[in-house]
Amino acid sequence: RTYFQDRQQDACRVLALSGLVSNKRRYDGVHALLDNCYQPRQLQVLVDALPTAPGLTAIEAPTGSGKTETALAYAWKLIDQQLAESVIFALPTQATANAMLSRMEANASRLFTSPNLILAHGNSRFNHLFQSIKSRAFTEQGQEEAWVQCCQWLSQSNKKVFLGQIGVCTIDQVLISVLPVKHRFIRGLGIGRSVLIVDEVHAYDTYMNGLLEAVLKAQADVGGSVILLSATLPMKQKQKLLDTYGLHTDPEENNSAYPLINWRGVNDAQRFDLLAHPEQLPPRFSIQPEPIYSADMLPDLTMLERMIAAANAGAQVCLICNLVDVAQ
């Protein structure tokens, strides 16, 4: 027995040294994921009110309302409470997955120390950002850091993508986990230990929705968490997805408001009507236009210096040009 316990400790130590296991950072609220000039919005301020328990969360809100940051902050909160170990972000297309990789790259180090950030789809090898992530960071001794080696190993096969800390993929990589294919248990293992975030849920067809329901049921069986994001969901589709976690509720109760957050646990259900919460807006400010004339319609040195000084003071500066050549 002592031998077995010692080997368990050795195994944990080896996993940490290899980069497969990364230390999580303490949850610091959704504001930690936002730029300094932004304040949490109406949807984002509800993160701390969401249950700290495994479950299915369906977030319906307009485009641009901050659903991505809300989902990532909630996943961070669950990871901090030992309810998950990693994050998987599944999107409908390769283009949206590539764009999400850039956003996750900016936030990965806020959730974990030396995280493995993996992109998985059929053309991930052509993504320049992902290639730079895989080859990043050498120590002063000229040896690759463990997390870089681990990232390269995980990226060798899409089936291993979910074994890291943060995975960004197309939705098919997740759906394969419930199909009768070789080594699907590897995907299932990675998904089960993660908070699965599925974006643009309304974009999937009937067949894909059937597979997605199977994925959600598998997550419920292992006590995992899922976050579904959509601008809007048809009532029938939303009810079928929510019912995968076992607790059935009145369909009208889940569709009586918009924007809306539905949370479904194994033995509990909660809903958060965003209309009942005041929208968090930045302080009002006034704008006073000041016309400045230039012979060639280009900013002179004095104007450029004013723009730089304003930016250094925290202002958001935008220069709009009439010609493409000038803008470039």
PLM segments and residue spans:
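Conserved Walker A/P-loop ATP-binding site and its immediately adjacent core
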Residues: 86-107, 117-128, 233-237, 324-325
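Walker A/P-loop NTP-binding motif
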Residues: 68-83, 103, 215-218
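A substrate-engagement module of RecA-like helicase motors
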Residues: 104-165, 171-175
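Conserved interdomain linker/interface between the two RecA-like ATPase lobes of SF2 helicase motors
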Residues: 248-327
